[in-house]
From Swiss-Prot:
UniProt record similarity statement: Belongs to the class-II aminoacyl-tRNA synthetase family. ProS type 1 subfamily.
Phylogenetic placement of the source organism: Bacteria, Pseudomonadati, Pseudomonadota, Gammaproteobacteria, Alteromonadales
A GO CC term attached to the entry: cytosol
Protein name: Proline--tRNA ligase
EC class of the enzyme, as a word: ligase
């Protein structure tokens, strides 16, 4: 490709609203342009990278037994009403009407559409298992689109859906897809981790996320220092603490704690060790219990894991904290003075709190706290659950090593959905006994456009993007110095351009009438892995200059060896 026939569109500076590196560099390198909030046009350079990601994903999906389809982005509301997600999905679901005032949605995902297809087209167990995938545009009406294509409203995604007669068959396909995802990210050259995950609004049972490691990642991921255990912060667990309780050392006492509204104030003003404190949080209860509120009790230095909490049967989902007026209607105290002793509502205790002794908590009287509380003696221990976020250094739940934490960008997510959608939509086939059987389902997503941004977050320097040979928009850039004044420079540049193209190598020929410094800066900004510099001075010595983008190393290559040399670099 000649730059004079190409939409290069590089920029010296990024807009002020581009915060993270990938957003800045994608704009500066001429990969994307913002059309509106969360909406981007992919320019030629960006599209070339996007297509390379798509190709690898498509190849590995087909290798794993996937069959490609293409479904409409506009979906009838009837399907979403059938599964109940019309009301459940929330503001991210963009609802539209056609000229006949019929309701539709702009698809954020395609579980309903694929299930509708399968229930019409598949009628026998002999047609299963079946794994269908597509690479398609999605739309989610994000509250705050940000970080460029990392969290855009419109994005490109590969989503796959598998259908099975039973759980055992689903688990086999799930493992195939897990392995396929690992191959995809290996081929893309990304540093990543698969982690155990929560199923979220998609539903189902087992789930894994795939995270590209990057400091700018929005997600906290947790992994063992000595085993393969890894999970996102929502799902991560620490090894359950010993259930042996230390014997009480003192009687429970009542403390005056004026102006101690927080754990930090209680610790600083009254000299209580933070690990000997607990905090009591009131949330809305589910309809499975008789009271409107339920209390969650965690250690003072721990954070509530809201996903773990709302997954409990007695807690309303989504999680909703009680207001002070709602709390005072049940307890003669407000937040900051609450605790388990004589609490008039049911409560759930975190595992770490269940093994505490001689601890302090609110007395359910304003400006009062109890000290030296002990389970069994002062208050009966009720339901015990894992309620907290893990912290660095917690023992790994596998019993091997401790937990470490890193930031990650979620680029893939796979689910064992079970019959969440097939049961709601009555999607079944005739089994071997000739009876209708509801299908079991899996779901597997990869953020194609997000992968591009994540790769840049992992591979950049002060000069721009550093693409590997797999993802680079062009493998080689030819920079001819003053070619418009030097016939032999122009002639050799044309020769290399033709020969590299004939060899199937993607090459950018910078034939602009620009200063060499601008041409070099653009090549580095775009992240092209291999640069060939042709100039009169080097030609006098029978060589050209080669520069490797990753290492920055320059070397001279004999004129007649250039093509073979480049082939070797790409091998």
């Amino acid at each position: 490709m000649r730059t004079t026939n190409y939409l290069l569109s590089t920029q010296k500076e990024a807009p002020s609203d581009a915060v993270i590196v990938s957003h800045q560099l994608m704009l500066r390198a001429g990969m994307i342009r913002k059309l509106a909030s969360g909406l981007y046009t992919w320019l030629p350079t960006g599209l070339r990278v996007l297509r390379k990601v798509e190709t690898i994903v498509r190849e590995e999906m087909e290798r794993a037994g996937g069959v490609e389809v293409l479904m409409p982005i506009v979906q009838p509301a009837d399907l979403w009403l059938e599964t109940g997600r019309w009301d459940q999905y929330g503001g991210e679901l963009l609802r539209i009407k056609d000229r006949h005032t019929r309701d539709f949605v702009l698809g954020p995902t395609h579980e309903e559409v694929i299930t509708e297809l399968v229930r019409k087209e598949v009628n026998s167990y002999k047609q299963l298992p079946l794994n269908l995938f597509q690479i398609q545009t999605k739309f989610r009406d994000e509250t705050r689109p940000r970080f460029g294509v990392m969290r855009a409203r419109e994005f490109t995604m590969k989503d796959a859906y598998s259908f099975h007669m039973d759980q055992a068959c689903l688990e086999k396909t799930y493992q195939k897809m897990f392995d396929a995802y690992c191959r995809i990210f290996d081929r893309l050259g990304l540093e990543y981790r698969p982690v155990i995950a929560d199923t979220g609004s998609i539903g189902g049972s087992a789930s894994h996320e795939f995270h590209v490691l990057a400091q700018s990642g929005e997600d906290a991921i947790v992994f063992s220092t000595e085993s393969d255990y890894a999970a996102n912060i929502e799902k991560a667990e620490a090894l359950a603490p010993s259930t042996v309780l230390a014997a009480p050392t003192a009687e429970m006492g009542l403390l005056d704690t004026p102006n101690a509204k927080t754990i930090a104030e209680l610790v600083s003003k009254h000299g209580i060790a933070i690990e000997k404190t607990v905090k009591t949080l009131f949330v809305k209860a589910s309809d499975q219990i008789e009271t409107e509120l339920i209390a969650l009790i965690i250690r003072g230095d721990h954070e509530l894991n809201e996903i773990k909490a709302e997954n409990l049967a007695s807690v309303a989902a989504p999680l909703e904290f009680a207001s002070e007026s709602e709390i005072r209607a049940l307890v003669n105290a407000g937040p900051g003075s609450l605790g388990p002793v004589s609490l008039p509502v049911p409560f759930i205790v975190d595992r770490s709190v269940a093994v505490m002794s001689d601890f302090s908590a609110g007395a359910n009287i304003d400006n009062k706290h109890y000290c030296n509380i002990n389970w069994g003696r002062d208050v009966e221990l009720a339901q015990v659950e894992d309620l907290r976020n893990v912290v660095e250094g917690d023992p790994s739940p596998c019993g091997s090593g401790t937990l470490s934490m890193a930031r990650g960008i979620e680029v893939g997510h796979i689910f064992q959905l079970g019959d969440t959608y097939t049961k709601a939509m009555n999607a079944g086939v005739l089994n071997q006994q000739g009876k209708n059987q509801i299908l079991t389902m899996g779901c597997y997503g990869i953020g194609i456009s997000r992968i591009v941004a994540a790769a840049i977050e992992q591979n950049n320097d002060k000069n721009g993007i550093i693409w590997n040979n797999t993802l680079a928009p062009f493998s080689v850039v030819i920079v001819p110095m003053n070619m418009h004044k030097s016939h032999r420079v122009a002639e050799l540049a044309e020769k290399y351009y033709a020969e590299l193209q004939a060899a199937g190598i993607e090459v950018l020929f910078d034939d602009r009438k620009e200063r060499p410094g601008i041409m070099f800066a653009d090549a580095e900004l775009m992240g092209i892995p291999h640069t060939l510099v042709i100039g009169d001075r080097s030609l006098d010595n029978g060589v050209i200059e080669y520069k490797d983008r990753l290492s920055g190393v320059k070397q001279e290559v004999a004129i007649d060896e250039v093509i073979n040399f480049i082939k070797a670099q790409l091998a």
